[in-house]
Amino acid sequence: MTAPALRTLSQSSLQDYADCPRRFQLRYLEQLQYPAVESEPALENEKHQQEGEYFHRLVQQHLIGIPAERVGRLANTANLARWWDNYLRADFPINDYAKHPEVTLSAPLGPFRLVAKYDLVVVRDGQALIYDWKTYRKRPRTEWLAPRWQTRIYRALLGKAGNHLNGDQPIGPEQIQMVYWFADFPSEPAVFPYNAGQFQRDWDALVKLAEEIAAATNFALTDDLQRCAYCPYRGYCDRGVRAGDAADAESEMEADELFDVNFEQVGEIAF
Protein backbone atom coordinates (compact mmCIF):
# COMPACT_ATOMS: atom_id res chain seq x y z
CA MET A 1 0.00 0.00 0.00
CA THR A 2 1.44 3.38 -1.01
CA ALA A 3 1.59 6.05 1.68
CA PRO A 4 -0.41 9.22 0.92
CA ALA A 5 1.53 12.14 -0.52
CA LEU A 6 2.95 14.55 2.03
CA ARG A 7 0.92 17.76 2.03
CA THR A 8 1.99 19.62 5.16
CA LEU A 9 5.23 20.51 6.90
CA SER A 10 5.58 21.40 10.57
CA GLN A 11 8.32 22.37 12.97
CA SER A 12 8.68 18.72 13.96
CA SER A 13 8.90 17.37 10.43
CA LEU A 14 11.39 20.03 9.37
CA GLN A 15 13.47 19.47 12.49
CA ASP A 16 13.44 15.76 11.71
CA TYR A 17 14.67 16.47 8.19
CA ALA A 18 17.40 18.75 9.49
CA ASP A 19 18.49 16.24 12.15
CA CYS A 20 18.19 13.07 10.06
CA PRO A 21 16.63 12.93 6.57
CA ARG A 22 16.21 9.17 6.97
CA ARG A 23 14.00 9.65 10.04
CA PHE A 24 11.94 12.17 8.09
CA GLN A 25 11.50 9.59 5.33
CA LEU A 26 10.49 6.78 7.70
CA ARG A 27 8.14 8.92 9.75
CA TYR A 28 6.43 11.19 7.25
CA LEU A 29 6.82 9.61 3.82
CA GLU A 30 6.63 5.91 4.65
CA GLN A 31 4.59 6.53 7.83
CA LEU A 32 6.09 3.56 9.65
CA GLN A 33 5.24 2.71 13.23
CA TYR A 34 7.78 3.30 16.00
CA PRO A 35 9.68 0.00 16.41
CA ALA A 36 11.66 1.03 19.51
CA VAL A 37 11.38 2.90 22.78
CA GLU A 38 12.68 6.43 22.26
CA SER A 39 14.20 6.89 25.72
CA GLU A 40 14.72 5.17 29.07
CA PRO A 41 13.24 4.49 31.56
CA ALA A 42 10.30 3.89 29.21
CA LEU A 43 7.31 3.81 31.58
CA GLU A 44 8.52 6.79 33.59
CA ASN A 45 9.08 8.87 30.47
CA GLU A 46 5.73 7.90 28.98
CA LYS A 47 4.00 8.98 32.20
CA HIS A 48 5.91 12.27 32.19
CA GLN A 49 4.90 12.97 28.58
CA GLN A 50 1.26 12.19 29.35
CA GLU A 51 1.36 14.53 32.32
CA GLY A 52 2.85 17.22 30.09
CA GLU A 53 0.02 16.83 27.60
CA TYR A 54 -2.52 16.98 30.43
CA PHE A 55 -0.92 20.14 31.82
CA HIS A 56 -1.38 21.78 28.42
CA ARG A 57 -5.09 20.92 28.56
CA LEU A 58 -5.42 22.35 32.07
CA VAL A 59 -3.86 25.64 30.98
CA GLN A 60 -6.07 25.78 27.91
CA GLN A 61 -9.20 25.29 30.03
CA HIS A 62 -8.12 28.08 32.35
CA LEU A 63 -7.36 30.43 29.46
CA ILE A 64 -10.82 29.97 27.95
CA GLY A 65 -12.40 31.08 31.21
CA ILE A 66 -12.90 28.07 33.46
CA PRO A 67 -12.10 29.13 37.05
CA ALA A 68 -8.66 28.16 38.31
CA GLU A 69 -10.12 26.45 41.39
CA ARG A 70 -12.19 24.14 39.22
CA VAL A 71 -9.35 23.35 36.83
CA GLY A 72 -6.89 22.85 39.66
CA ARG A 73 -8.88 19.94 41.06
CA LEU A 74 -7.75 17.96 38.02
CA ALA A 75 -4.05 18.45 38.80
CA ASN A 76 -4.03 15.11 40.58
CA THR A 77 -0.38 14.03 40.41
CA ALA A 78 2.67 15.50 42.11
CA ASN A 79 4.04 16.83 38.82
CA LEU A 80 0.72 18.31 37.72
CA ALA A 81 0.11 19.93 41.11
CA ARG A 82 3.58 21.52 41.08
CA TRP A 83 3.32 22.73 37.48
CA TRP A 84 -0.18 24.09 38.07
CA ASP A 85 0.92 25.95 41.20
CA ASN A 86 3.90 27.41 39.33
CA TYR A 87 1.61 28.47 36.47
CA LEU A 88 -0.82 30.24 38.81
CA ARG A 89 2.05 32.01 40.58
CA ALA A 90 3.69 33.15 37.34
CA ASP A 91 3.31 36.79 36.43
CA PHE A 92 2.35 36.56 32.75
CA PRO A 93 1.86 40.13 31.40
CA ILE A 94 -1.17 39.20 29.30
CA ASN A 95 -4.20 40.51 31.19
CA ASP A 96 -5.07 43.16 28.61
CA TYR A 97 -4.30 40.99 25.58
CA ALA A 98 -6.69 39.09 23.33
CA LYS A 99 -5.90 35.45 24.07
CA HIS A 100 -5.82 32.69 21.45
CA PRO A 101 -5.00 29.36 23.12
CA GLU A 102 -4.31 26.25 21.04
CA VAL A 103 -4.61 28.14 17.75
CA THR A 104 -3.36 26.64 14.48
CA LEU A 105 -1.97 28.78 11.64
CA SER A 106 -0.87 27.78 8.16
CA ALA A 107 0.57 29.31 5.01
CA PRO A 108 1.71 28.03 1.60
CA LEU A 109 5.32 26.89 1.46
CA GLY A 110 6.34 25.71 -2.00
CA PRO A 111 4.25 22.63 -2.85
CA PHE A 112 3.32 22.19 0.83
CA ARG A 113 1.48 24.03 3.58
CA LEU A 114 3.46 25.03 6.63
CA VAL A 115 1.36 24.42 9.74
CA ALA A 116 1.93 25.18 13.41
CA LYS A 117 -0.22 24.71 16.48
CA TYR A 118 0.53 27.28 19.18
CA ASP A 119 -0.03 26.79 22.89
CA LEU A 120 -0.97 30.45 23.23
CA VAL A 121 -0.81 33.61 21.15
CA VAL A 122 -1.79 36.90 22.78
CA VAL A 123 -2.24 40.13 20.82
CA ARG A 124 -2.71 43.77 21.81
CA ASP A 125 -2.31 46.88 19.65
CA GLY A 126 -0.42 44.93 17.01
CA GLN A 127 1.99 43.43 19.56
CA ALA A 128 2.03 39.63 19.72
CA LEU A 129 3.47 37.23 22.27
CA ILE A 130 3.82 33.51 21.62
CA TYR A 131 3.86 31.27 24.69
CA ASP A 132 4.96 27.66 24.56
CA TRP A 133 4.63 25.57 27.71
CA LYS A 134 7.42 23.09 28.41
CA THR A 135 7.45 20.47 31.18
CA TYR A 136 11.03 19.26 30.84
CA ARG A 137 12.93 17.91 33.82
CA LYS A 138 15.95 20.04 32.93
CA ARG A 139 15.98 23.42 31.25
CA PRO A 140 17.48 23.41 27.74
CA ARG A 141 20.12 26.02 27.00
CA THR A 142 18.74 29.21 25.45
CA GLU A 143 21.45 29.16 22.80
CA TRP A 144 20.37 25.63 21.86
CA LEU A 145 16.73 26.68 21.53
CA ALA A 146 17.45 29.73 19.35
CA PRO A 147 18.16 27.92 16.04
CA ARG A 148 15.55 25.19 16.52
CA TRP A 149 12.90 25.13 13.84
CA GLN A 150 10.13 25.58 16.40
CA THR A 151 11.60 28.92 17.48
CA ARG A 152 12.07 30.07 13.90
CA ILE A 153 8.81 28.76 12.43
CA TYR A 154 6.46 29.93 15.18
CA ARG A 155 7.62 33.53 14.86
CA ALA A 156 7.85 33.54 11.06
CA LEU A 157 4.46 31.90 10.54
CA LEU A 158 2.76 34.30 12.93
CA GLY A 159 4.14 37.16 10.86
CA LYS A 160 3.03 35.50 7.64
CA ALA A 161 -0.40 34.20 8.67
CA GLY A 162 -1.39 35.94 11.91
CA ASN A 163 -3.57 38.69 10.43
CA HIS A 164 -6.76 36.99 11.63
CA LEU A 165 -5.57 37.35 15.20
CA ASN A 166 -4.93 41.08 14.81
CA GLY A 167 -8.12 42.46 13.30
CA ASP A 168 -7.03 41.42 9.78
CA GLN A 169 -3.94 43.61 10.10
CA PRO A 170 -0.43 42.18 9.57
CA ILE A 171 1.79 41.65 12.59
CA GLY A 172 5.24 43.06 11.88
CA PRO A 173 8.25 40.92 12.82
CA GLU A 174 9.45 43.53 15.33
CA GLN A 175 6.11 43.20 17.12
CA ILE A 176 6.55 39.45 17.69
CA GLN A 177 8.17 37.80 20.68
CA MET A 178 8.29 34.11 21.62
CA VAL A 179 8.52 32.81 25.17
CA TYR A 180 9.28 29.26 26.23
CA TRP A 181 7.92 28.92 29.76
CA PHE A 182 9.27 25.97 31.72
CA ALA A 183 6.82 24.64 34.30
CA ASP A 184 9.62 23.33 36.52
CA PHE A 185 11.72 26.47 36.06
CA PRO A 186 9.07 29.21 36.17
CA SER A 187 11.53 32.05 36.76
CA GLU A 188 13.79 31.03 33.85
CA PRO A 189 11.81 31.56 30.63
CA ALA A 190 13.62 31.66 27.30
CA VAL A 191 12.60 34.82 25.43
CA PHE A 192 13.17 35.38 21.72
CA PRO A 193 12.34 38.75 20.10
CA TYR A 194 12.18 39.05 16.33
CA ASN A 195 12.98 41.47 13.53
CA ALA A 196 12.51 41.87 9.78
CA GLY A 197 15.97 40.56 8.95
CA GLN A 198 15.40 37.38 10.93
CA PHE A 199 11.99 36.92 9.34
CA GLN A 200 13.40 37.18 5.82
CA ARG A 201 16.24 34.78 6.58
CA ASP A 202 13.88 32.30 8.21
CA TRP A 203 11.32 32.38 5.41
CA ASP A 204 13.96 32.10 2.70
CA ALA A 205 15.44 29.10 4.53
CA LEU A 206 12.01 27.51 4.83
CA VAL A 207 11.29 27.94 1.12
CA LYS A 208 14.67 26.44 0.23
CA LEU A 209 14.14 23.51 2.59
CA ALA A 210 10.65 22.81 1.22
CA GLU A 211 11.99 22.79 -2.33
CA GLU A 212 14.80 20.45 -1.28
CA ILE A 213 12.34 18.04 0.34
CA ALA A 214 10.03 18.10 -2.68
CA ALA A 215 12.90 17.17 -4.99
CA ALA A 216 14.65 14.68 -2.69
CA THR A 217 15.14 11.09 -3.80
CA ASN A 218 17.80 10.10 -1.26
CA PHE A 219 17.35 10.49 2.49
CA ALA A 220 20.68 10.02 4.23
CA LEU A 221 21.25 8.82 7.78
CA THR A 222 22.54 11.35 10.27
CA ASP A 223 26.26 11.32 11.01
CA ASP A 224 25.53 12.14 14.66
CA LEU A 225 25.13 8.69 16.21
CA GLN A 226 24.13 10.23 19.55
CA ARG A 227 20.81 11.25 17.99
CA CYS A 228 20.08 7.61 17.21
CA ALA A 229 19.91 6.69 20.91
CA TYR A 230 16.76 8.84 21.24
CA CYS A 231 15.18 7.89 17.91
CA PRO A 232 12.42 5.25 17.95
CA TYR A 233 13.23 4.41 14.32
CA ARG A 234 16.80 3.34 15.05
CA GLY A 235 15.83 -0.33 14.63
CA TYR A 236 15.24 0.27 10.91
CA CYS A 237 18.77 1.60 10.56
CA ASP A 238 20.72 -0.89 12.73
CA ARG A 239 21.77 2.02 14.92
CA GLY A 240 21.51 0.33 18.33
CA VAL A 241 18.98 -1.29 20.64
CA ARG A 242 19.26 0.50 23.98
CA ALA A 243 17.49 3.85 24.27
CA GLY A 244 19.14 6.98 25.63
CA ASP A 245 18.26 8.66 28.91
CA ALA A 246 15.63 11.35 28.33
CA ALA A 247 16.67 13.16 31.51
CA ASP A 248 19.14 15.02 29.30
CA ALA A 249 17.31 18.29 28.66
CA GLU A 250 17.96 18.71 24.96
CA SER A 251 17.46 15.04 24.17
CA GLU A 252 14.19 15.22 26.09
CA MET A 253 13.07 18.06 23.85
CA GLU A 254 14.00 16.08 20.75
CA ALA A 255 12.06 13.06 22.01
CA ASP A 256 9.07 15.29 22.77
CA GLU A 257 9.04 16.50 19.17
CA LEU A 258 8.43 12.94 18.02
CA PHE A 259 4.87 13.27 19.31
CA ASP A 260 3.62 15.68 16.68
CA VAL A 261 0.12 16.82 15.81
CA ASN A 262 -1.59 15.26 12.80
CA PHE A 263 -2.24 18.49 10.93
CA GLU A 264 -4.44 16.79 8.35
CA GLN A 265 -7.07 16.47 11.10
CA VAL A 266 -7.05 19.87 12.81
CA GLY A 267 -8.75 23.15 12.02
CA GLU A 268 -6.58 26.09 11.09
CA ILE A 269 -6.55 29.77 10.31
CA ALA A 270 -5.10 29.77 6.81
CA PHE A 271 -3.18 32.49 5.00
Region roles according to the model:
Residues 3, 118, 162, 226-229:
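Anion-coordinating catalytic cores for phosphoryl-, nucleotidyl-, and glycosidic chemistry
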Residues 1-121:
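Metal-dependent nuclease catalytic cores that hydrolyze phosphodiester bonds in DNA/RNA
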